[in-house]
Amino acid sequence: MAESILVPVDGSDESIKALEYAVEEYSDTDLTVLSVVNPGEAYDIEIVVDAHPRSDPPETANERAKAALERAKEIAPDAETVRARGPVSQTIVTYAEDESTDLIVIGSRGRGGASRVLLGSVAETVARRAPCPVLIVR
């Protein structure tokens, strides 16, 4: 059984669903909620997909990360919350390695096929590179 679980959140419905799943299924486990701000990303992927590019200054990305962690605290008040900066997938994997995480529970938007190849998927990249099992919640 997993002793330490990492749940990356970005405030999306999918990441909150993954957190709720982790809280329900792993209530006796040390839970860490991680929000990653990538200062190098100029666009939100949803906005690029919708053809309405918008550049978010770092303050906005930080505000979103803070809001995601505040929401996480409502769902999992006993969880440790961590905010990190860097490329999202890489930062999640590195954190899991550094902290000897037993399991990562991550949400997925459920994109597949060409859109997944074109846009990439944080959940898919984490699943391929993580040092531990990854449970993807849809």
Predicted regions and their residues:
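Small/aliphatic-rich secondary-structure junction motif
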Residues: 2-49
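General small-molecule cofactor/ligand-binding pocket signal
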Residues: 32-34, 80-84, 135
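Gly/Ser-rich helix-loop-strand patches that form or flank binding pockets
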Residues: 102-138
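Structural beta-alpha unit
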Residues: 73-104, 129
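A short acidic, glycine-rich active-site loop
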Residues: 51-67
